[in-house]
């Protein structure tokens, strides 16, 4: 492949400082296993699984083979009134993996679409049961639920909201659980903070619980900075939702598919949602795919009227795409056959031990970890939020390791094919980079 750069002018890049990038481009041309190859033939270790998604590493031969074979056999088939065997097999496999009460899968093309689909399912479910007055939605401060209008409305990332003006009406937000005074440098789940779930009751009493359709949150708030839920917090949220007939949606786009060491974050924290959103790791990042898993009673509420009538007026041109389904099935088989979730569990203590040693390094004010997820929060430069973390990102890249920044937090989530030495290299590169910057 040529080392010459393409014309960079016309591509409007997402979540990127386009002007800076085009003056200082970082371009990948190949990937394999734990590593990218840059356009100028440098090797970069992937310490963030692409974008929280390449759990089986890059270009896994069995996943590549499945995609190639599917492209040669059936390249596309609409899911509207038609089907193909691979997507039904994918749905069955997902239900087998999910908590027992989640029995049906609806397919999308991304986590953002999965969230907007989940919100529509929640609203339509209540209408189908004669409770159309349940229209309010409750998210969380610093929650990230993709970039659709539904997702940014229930989400709590202010930069993702303020550019666009009006959001969906009737949305409230719980406070987030991140508290440096009480939880700085917590190892695993913080002990302080389960009482913050009681704010949900306060919001419900303000509006009348019978007007609320759903509560949505991430088991671990990944994009906010890897905020781990306090012990008992999610259980309390579940109990309050049950008490008032409110659906609980858990956004498992990041935490799903082994990232916590369990199949899903729901399993790790012992809380089963009514609706679960998934994406990213379900195809190990190879082909865009997302999905929504729901309980039996939610699916059944739609199965009324004439048998040949459309039950849910929603879907996408590429819902259940054959290539995505083939990639997904192959990915789930790789996870199982190669014991990758078990490897993630084995690597979690290594990540924990290494990342906690960063305490005391330049500018560090907090460290968090759970499963194969870790984050280091930095004291921001006054008047220049995000600048310090971006400096670490660039320094790590120059040293041959890719990490992720969100605000002034550095996130690490290596692929499950990593070795203990790989994990140590990622964390040590972050530590060395912190020592190298101002």
Indicate where each model-derived feature is located.
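Conserved N-terminal phosphate-binding loop of PLP-dependent enzymes in the Aspartate aminotransferase
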Residues: 1-438
């Amino acid at each position: 492949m040529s080392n010459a750069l393409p014309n960079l002018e016309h591509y409007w890049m997402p979540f990127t400082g386009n002007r800076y990038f085009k003056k200082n481009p970082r371009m990948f041309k190949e990937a394999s296993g734990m590593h990218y190859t840059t356009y100028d033939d440098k090797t970069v270790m992937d310490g963030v699984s692409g974008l929280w998604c390449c759990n089986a590493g890059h270009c896994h031969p069995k996943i590549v083979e499945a995609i190639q074979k599917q492209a040669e056999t059936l390249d596309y088939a609409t899911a509207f009134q038609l089907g193909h065997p691979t997507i039904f097999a994918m749905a069955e496999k997902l239900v087998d993996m999910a908590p027992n009460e989640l029995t049906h899968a609806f397919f999308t093309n991304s986590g953002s679409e999965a969230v907007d689909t989940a919100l529509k399912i929640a609203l339509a479910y209540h209408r189908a049961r004669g409770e159309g007055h349940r229209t309010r939605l409750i998210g969380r401060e610093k929650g990230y639920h993709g970039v659709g209008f539904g997702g940014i409305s229930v989400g709590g990332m202010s930069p993702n909201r303020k550019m666009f003006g009006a959001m969906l009406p009737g949305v409230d937000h719980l406070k987030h659980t991140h508290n440096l005074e009480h939880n700085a440098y917590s190892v695993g789940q913080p002990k302080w903070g389960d009482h913050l779930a009681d704010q949900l009751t306060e919001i419900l009493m303000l509006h009348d619980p019978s007007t609320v359709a759903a509560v949505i949150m991430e088991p671990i708030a990944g994009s906010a900075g890897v905020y781990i839920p306090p012990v008992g917090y999610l259980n309390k949220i579940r109990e309050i939702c049950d008490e008032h007939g409110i659906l609980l949606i858990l956004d498992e786009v990041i935490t799903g598919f082994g990232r916590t060491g369990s199949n899903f974050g729901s399993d790790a924290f012992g809380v089963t949602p009514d609706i679960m959103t998934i994406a990213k790791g379900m195809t190990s990042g190879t082909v865009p795919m997302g999905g929504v898993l729901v309980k039996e009673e939610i699916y059944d509420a739609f199965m009324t009227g004439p048998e040949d009538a459309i039950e849910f007026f929603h879907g996408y041109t590429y819902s259940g795409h054959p290539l995505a389904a083939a990639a997904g099935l192959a990915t789930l088989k790789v996870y199982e056959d190669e014991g990758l979730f078990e490897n993630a569990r084995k690597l979690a203590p290594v990540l924990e031990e290494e990342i906690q040693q960063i305490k005391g390094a330049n500018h560090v004010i907090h460290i968090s970890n759970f499963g194969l997820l870790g984050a280091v929060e930095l004291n921001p430069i006054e008047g220049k939020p995000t600048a310090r973390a971006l400096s670490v990102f660039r320094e790590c890249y120059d040293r041959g390791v890719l990490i992720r920044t969100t605000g002034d937090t550095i996130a690490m989530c290596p692929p499950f094919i990593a070795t203990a030495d790989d994990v140590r290299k990622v964390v040590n590169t972050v530590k060395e980079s912190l020592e190298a910057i101002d």
